[in-house]
């Protein structure tokens, strides 16, 4: 079996406080993009993995291996699987590529191994693998996330804009981003849920500046090449541009795909780009 593992962008990301356990509470809107890894699953006696990107570990530290092991433990089985990851989504980019891979492994192996684990069990496994893994496991379109990013509300809608996503060849560690972002816990924030529902229903772009990303200012100060990408996007037709997650990837929303493609010409040729059509929803190709 073969499955696509799609990436995401964050449309707005508010860090609202720090928890006693050391994690931060946040609010964000997850939106899927048509940039994906492909995972091939083949029957085997043990769990193993190979990857087209030699920079990624394929040992027990890999999230795909961790996901398979977690399923084994939760179900009390010793089933095997041979996984091949065709890595296309940049890592260290704020696009959730590793989390999406892990969610895909959970979904596919729950089926292939005939475990039929309930939603709550899968959610508990997913959260331990990564805060945004539940989004990729249970949603296909836009979702509101609270808590540490694990409390989800599927909004049953999609963005009416083409999305140009840009990776400027910088890897920003999430740990670094949380240590260095400029704290604005006391700010009164707009309701992201209401904002994005209105945006998707009406296409009215006037509220787009309200979708701020709290990582952006610190990242831009430390990584000026990342800041420059946002400037290029806004100067070349983007209705809105922002950092995704903790970066370094950025995205621009465009009225149509033609304008998004035209904007690529303004970017350095070494930067990796992806265009997502309006109203995109995820379909991993498995029918699950």
Curated annotation (Swiss-Prot):
Pathway: Isoprenoid biosynthesis; isopentenyl diphosphate biosynthesis via DXP pathway; isopentenyl diphosphate from 1-deoxy-D-xylulose 5-phosphate: step 3/6. It catalyses: 4-CDP-2-C-methyl-D-erythritol + ATP = 4-CDP-2-C-methyl-D-erythritol 2-phosphate + ADP + H(+). GO terms for biological process: isopentenyl diphosphate biosynthetic process, methylerythritol 4-phosphate pathway; terpenoid biosynthetic process. InterPro entries: GHMP_kinase_C_dom, GHMP_kinase_C_sf, GHMP_kinase_N_dom, IspE, Ribosomal_Su5_D2-typ_SF, Ribsml_uS5_D2-typ_fold_subgr. The active site is at 8, 132. Catalyzes the phosphorylation of the position 2 hydroxy group of 4-diphosphocytidyl-2C-methyl-D-erythritol. Its EC number is 2.7.1.148. Keywords: ATP-binding, Isoprene biosynthesis, Kinase, Nucleotide-binding, Transferase. This is 4-diphosphocytidyl-2-C-methyl-D-erythritol kinase.
